[in-house]
Regions:
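Active-site-proximal specificity loops/subdomain of glycosyltransferases
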Residues: 1-41
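Loop/turn elements at helix/coil->beta-strand transitions in domains of secreted/extracellular proteins
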Residues: 3-5, 40, 71-74, 138-140
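Short, solvent-exposed loop/turn segments at secondary-structure junctions
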Residues: 13-14, 50-51, 81-84, 105, ...
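Short beta-strand-to-loop acidic/aromatic patch adjacent to the donor-nucleotide binding site
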Residues: 39-51
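A structural signal for short, well-ordered beta-strand segments and their strand-loop junctions
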Residues: 45, 75-77, 109, 142-146
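Conserved catalytic core of nucleotide-sugar-dependent glycosyltransferases
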Residues: 53-129
Length: 279
């Protein structure tokens, strides 16, 4: 509901004149003001250069109980870094929701309990990278849709200088007016782990060459040694982002990244024993 709308003005009087410092000051001010109202249980953050899907608010309404009720949750995000049209099947993935160890941002929701922890130590710059650091994340997860509920309309501009414009411009934005989201497998970390381990154990291990040649079928597992360099080499061959923050590949959960290659679901995975030990 937008019945209570208030404009917050922040005089730009802080130290540091570049975009990263200004953004951090802006977010601190806006979140502080929003949570100053005792009735605010959670806040959705939406930047001005994002287009939202028709079911954007429906997604956050669906995952709000998970964000509120599970201490293993850091935030919810409307964004999937691997949500390019070549990596998702909209018809099959439209209602799917996953946990991730990676904070994607670009339309996200934060609960009061997390803000009360992070607000007093909010950084002067690079707030998103700071939030991804182990000291802040503390092994907590982000819940996000497989099909993005936001689209970056200025992918060649902004503080990143268009660094990822090729990936951002190919993102698929949901056009669904109303979606019944499947949140059963993300209600707890135990449920998410059970789904992941069952999926990994059932998937045959194949070489990426088989996937690229079109001979793989169904859901397959392509293993890497757990290092980011090994992951990045596979990601590049699949046309995925070969990028990490604080040691976590974009979109990963326990080191596993799921992508589609045509009709095939590809699980880029460390050795199974390492996945089970990951925290």
């Amino acid at each position: 509901s937008l019945e209570r709308t208030r404009v917050v003005t922040q005089p730009d009087d802080g130290k540091g004149g570049d975009g990263y410092h200004r953004l951090a000051r802006h977010f601190r001010k806006a979140l502080t003001e929003a949570f100053a109202d005792a009735r605010t249980a959670r806040v959705i953050v939406l930047e001005e250069d994002l287009e939202v899907a028709p079911d954007f608010f429906g997604f956050f309404a669906a995952v709000a109980p998970v964000v509120d009720g599970d201490a293993s949750m850091l935030a919810a995000s409307a964004w999937n870094d691997n949500g390019q049209r070549r990596h998702v099947d909209v018809a099959k993935d439209i209602a799917r929701v996953e946990r991730s160890d990676f904070f994607g941002g670009l339309g996200w929701m934060l609960a009061r309990r997390v803000w009360e922890e992070l607000g007093p130590k909010w950084p002067d710059a690079y707030w998103d990278d700071w939030l991804r650091e182990p000291e802040q994340r503390r092994n907590r997860h982000v819940v996000r849709p497989v099909v993005c509920r936001t689209f970056h309309v200025k992918s060649t501009r902004g503080t990143s200088g268009g660094q990822y414009s090729h990936f951002l411009s190919d993102i698929v934005l949901s056009q669904s007016a109303s979606t019944v989201f499947d949140v059963d497998d993300v209600r707890s970390s135990a449920a998410a782990d059970a789904r992941l381990f069952a999926q990994l154990e059932a998937a045959p291990r194949v070489d990426l060459g088989e996937v690229l040649a079109g001979s793989a079928r169904g859901t397959v597992r392509v293993e890497y040694d757990g290092s980011f360099a090994a992951y990045a080499a596979l990601a590049r061959r699949l046309g995925a982002m070969d990028n990490e923050k604080a040691g976590v590949p974009r979109g990963a959960y326990r080191g596993v990244v799921e992508l589609r290659r045509g009709p095939v679901i590809v699980l880029l995975s460390p050795p199974l024993g390492r996945v089970r030990r990951a925290r």
